[in-house]
């Protein structure tokens, strides 16, 4: 199976053209070091006029309150708001090619919030069909060299070398006019560890002995993906500004951070746009047929358990919980690492991962304050089983329709968010994976039901292959998987993060049925990772 990209879509062209026109008739000095971007005259008055003129176009959909004529400053910041699923990654890739073609910009750093998004971005840029699209369909006479900054394991004795990805990015030369250099980095690597800040490497790059300094010398353009995770008071954003000092930051996202302006009675909270060039919001995206609508089913607990948990007090890294039943109240003082099963067996698998001066953080990502309370009902095994069964039923309803589409069959995926990794992966011996085992039993039962229906030969074969190997139908991705040595786990992670084409195929490379279509995660895939073939999403337990 080969994916195809469509060119000339107006909702994407508007964004690319807007960014490109910002630099129109701005002085750009090309006489710089071979490893550096051309120098943009950020003091040019043309920026103000160009930006304001773009914002006034009706097609850009920029609200009057976000149109401005403020000066640029030391870094030009441009904002593109695009709803999830409308092609942000494609648009910023297209923008990279266009800025290189028009202005010779060839050094871009893409900052993303997570390892999952970093992997997805790298995979997209390296795909053969993507390269062919920009070269053959759009006619760009250039190719992107993709570097991915990875965390390094503790180095043993010996010579200390610059991170390979940093070296390749910095040393990339403008003299090679058909090369564009892109470095992808997740936010944690900008702020943790000493990889980019240390200056005791044995070999320098272009005279620089500190990676951040070497990167700064390239005068990079920085693209920020998911800007709401890079607010101005966040460490990663501060590192981008102070350590990389980019000439230009282009933020692409469906959601932008909030900021407070004004004082006293005039104080208000607004979206933190700097120079918003394009606003493709949810309403416009849906009305234009660019995104799918969502049908939500709220599943009511079926158990008769009438219990609540209330947080009475939080202090000194401990929290006092009260377990309330119809007949009694019992208080327990818990600390980080304790299981809430101490309160009720229905809460097995839910632990405390953090306690601050005013809130308790649970392993499902929920944050609870003093006096907060929640029902125990939604944690019962019967509730989980009912939700799983309904999600599986809904999946097969959609899968049957998509498999027999007149315009060509579509592989249907389902995504399950869970909050207890142990329930899916099991312990070190693979035991106690109760949720995974429950899912397999329910899937097996539903497959047998589907096989009893009238099926086309092709779909019947697909269902039988699924029934013959239930484990092959599912895969999980959790943050802990990045260090898991198990080959089967690595294959699951690769299928979800890297092998998008194979995941969407009905047949694997060996010519056998590819039945993997049920994906499990905690919240690792909650943003940035997207797949148009996900038709069913189930949030198990109370995950916030």
Regions found by a protein language model. Give the residues of each.
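Pre-Walker A adenine-sensing motif
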Residues: 52-72
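Conserved P-loop NTPase catalytic core
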Residues: 218-221, 236-373, 413, 456-457
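Residues immediately C-terminal
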Residues: 189-190, 228-232, 257-258, 423, ...
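Conserved C-terminal RecA-like helicase domain
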Residues: 79, 83, 137-195, 199-200, ...
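Conserved ATPase-coupling elements of RecA-like P-loop NTPase cores
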Residues: 121, 192-201, 216, 227-239, ...
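Walker A/P-loop
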Residues: 71-95
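Conserved Walker A/P-loop ATP-binding site and its immediately adjacent core
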Residues: 91, 104-150, 188-189, 418-422
